[in-house]
């Protein structure tokens, strides 16, 4: 009974300190990683004179995609700060002197980190897809009300078959505008105007009307000539349906587990068909090469260079094994959701070896070490994502490699520290 009470006291103390440190770390990472991007979103929308409530909604709906990294790094930092503080204040020494194993210090951290892993998984699988859908619906509604929402000042915008260059954008007014036509019907036509007003023309098709003031129209003729005309005003129509389509489609990282699995299955079938065609090409080329080699044994007129050419083609074909871009991409994003969720639990093992060292300012030292580990983990995960398109191996191995490296590295450090 007394032993159980001692463990309970340790669990409550460690758990409370871990949760408080997690809260501090969570707000730190939230502001460091995300407040700048949130302010950029708010600034971009506010400059378009969108109401404050809509801006607030967009900001809130953007938060779940940031939480996927906030939870793992906060869990790591909290564990590092707590264990560093306990070691620095000799609390670890006191616990060990009382005959309590260090595993009872680690148990509450592991259990709470597992809860954070589950919370991260729910964010990735439920909250992120839902918030993305609502974000795109709201943004689409704003585009209906404000046509220039997708038009940035001092920028170049491609809208359907039209390339638009403009300077200032104020409300529905666009200044110093130049329009380049790239369609086959009116290719080579250029329009310019000092000012233009954008207004909604067709709500269902997202077509907007551009009222040009004092436009100049330059048209290139097919025979090499050109024509220049001027008018007091002109009407031009912009088709924003392409922009709406891109907004309405979610990125693979914003899909749920179920949606990712469905897309993976579709692209797996496509990859299998591609591999079948690839094998047929290889077999056809090998057969042609074998026939040519057999023929060369009896026919001296067979060109040796032709045989060498086929051998080179066969070697190049075997080196270029088919890789389905989307099959790799969707599988990588699926495992990334699991890996980031598991990181809340796996990264804390790197901090356990700190319990065997007594350092001054242990909380600060732990915080600094966690920052270093977070940067290394971020880099490894980013590097692994870049390799999924160039390597034909399973994306699961690449995406999980940073987690496994950190986890087993933590176990090795812990075993080594115990022997010191």
Label for each model-derived stretch:
Residues 1-11, 45-53, 316-324:
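Short, membrane-interfacial amphipathic segments enriched in basic
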Residues 13, 17-21, 104-117, 125:
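Start (N-cap) of specific transmembrane helices in multi-pass transporter permeases
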Residues 53, 57, 113-237:
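Non-transmembrane, extracytosolic/lumenal segments of membrane-associated proteins
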Residues 63-82:
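Long, hydrophobic alpha-helical segments
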Residues 79-93, 98:
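Transmembrane helix boundary and interhelical loop/hinge segments in multi-pass membrane proteins
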Residues 96-101, 391:
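Short helix-to-coil transition segments within interhelical loops
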Residues 290-334:
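Membrane-proximal, non-transmembrane alpha-helical segments
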Residues 322-416:
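Transmembrane alpha-helical segments that form the functional core of multipass membrane systems
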């Amino acid at each position: 009974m007394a032993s159980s009470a001692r463990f309970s006291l340790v669990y409550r103390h460690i758990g409370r300190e871990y949760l408080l440190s997690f809260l501090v770390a969570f707000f730190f990472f939230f502001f460091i990683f995300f407040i700048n991007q949130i302010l950029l979103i708010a600034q971009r929308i506010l400059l378009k004179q969108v109401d404050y409530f809509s801006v607030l909604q967009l900001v809130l709906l953007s938060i779940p995609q940031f939480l996927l990294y906030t939870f793992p790094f906060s869990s790591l930092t909290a564990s590092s700060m707590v264990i560093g503080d306990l070691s620095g204040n000799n609390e670890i020494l006191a616990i060990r002197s009382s005959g309590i194993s260090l595993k009872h210090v680690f148990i509450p951290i592991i259990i709470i980190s597992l809860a954070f892993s589950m919370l991260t998984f729910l964010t990735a699988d439920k909250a992120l897809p839902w918030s993305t859908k609502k974000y795109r619906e709201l943004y689409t509604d704003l585009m209906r009300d404000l046509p220039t929402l997708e038009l940035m000042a001092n920028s170049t915008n491609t809208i359907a078959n039209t390339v638009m260059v403009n300077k200032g954008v104020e409300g529905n007014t666009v200044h110093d505008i130049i329009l380049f036509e790239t369609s086959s019907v009116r290719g080579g036509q250029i329009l310019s105007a000092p000012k233009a007003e954008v207004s909604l023309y067709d709500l269902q098709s997202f077509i907007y009307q551009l009222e040009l003031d004092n436009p100049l129209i330059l048209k290139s003729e097919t025979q090499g000539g050109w024509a220049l005309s001027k008018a007091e005003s002109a009407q031009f129509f912009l088709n924003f349906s392409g922009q709406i389509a891109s907004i309405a489609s979610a990125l693979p990282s914003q899909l749920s587990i179920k949606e990712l699995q469905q897309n993976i299955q579709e692209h797996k079938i496509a990859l299998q068909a591609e591999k079948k065609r690839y094998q047929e090409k290889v077999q056809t080329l090998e057969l042609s090469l074998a026939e040519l080699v057999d023929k060369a044994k009896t026919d001296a007129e067979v060109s040796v260079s032709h045989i060498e050419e086929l051998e080179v083609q066969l070697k190049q074909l075997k080196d270029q094994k088919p890789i389905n871009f989307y099959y790799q991409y969707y599988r990588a994003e699926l495992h990334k959701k699991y890996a980031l969720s598991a990181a809340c639990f796996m990264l804390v093992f790197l901090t356990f070896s700190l319990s065997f060292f007594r350092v001054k300012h242990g909380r600060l030292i732990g915080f600094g070490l966690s920052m270093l580990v977070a940067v290394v983990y971020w880099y490894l995960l980013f590097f692994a994502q870049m390799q999924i398109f160039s390597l034909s191996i399973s994306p699961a191995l690449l995406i999980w490699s940073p987690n496994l490296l950190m986890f087993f590295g933590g176990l090795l450090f812990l075993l080594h520290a115990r022997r010191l």
